[in-house]
Curated annotation (Swiss-Prot):
Coiled coil: none
GO cellular component: mitochondrial inner membrane; respiratory chain complex I
Name recorded for this polypeptide: NADH dehydrogenase [ubiquinone] 1 subunit C1, mitochondrial
InterPro entries: NDUFC1 (IPR026192)
Length: 76
């Protein structure tokens, strides 16, 4: 196969994109109400509850690890 035949498809890939214009073109995106207008309070509650739970668990685990470290090294 000739090298020019291989370069033809590549030149199409490297060419700048052209956007179709005219009244027949439809947008792929629809204008909708922003998601912040009506928050899903159930998701908000689960998210905040999970966050609080994870922070409490992290701090509790950290304190247990500190006590274990002190016990093993004779610092307590």
């Amino acid at each position: 196969m000739a090298p020019s035949a291989l370069l033809r498809p590549l030149s199409r890939l490297l060419a700048p994109a052209r956007l179709p214009s005219g009244p027949s073109v439809r947008s792929k995106f629809y204008v909708r109400e922003p998601p912040n207008a009506k928050p899903d309070w159930l998701k908000v509650g689960f998210t905040l509850g999970t966050t609080v739970f994870l922070w409490v668990y992290l701090i509790k685990q950290h304190n247990e690890d500190i006590l274990e470290y002190k016990r093993r090294n004779g610092l307590e």
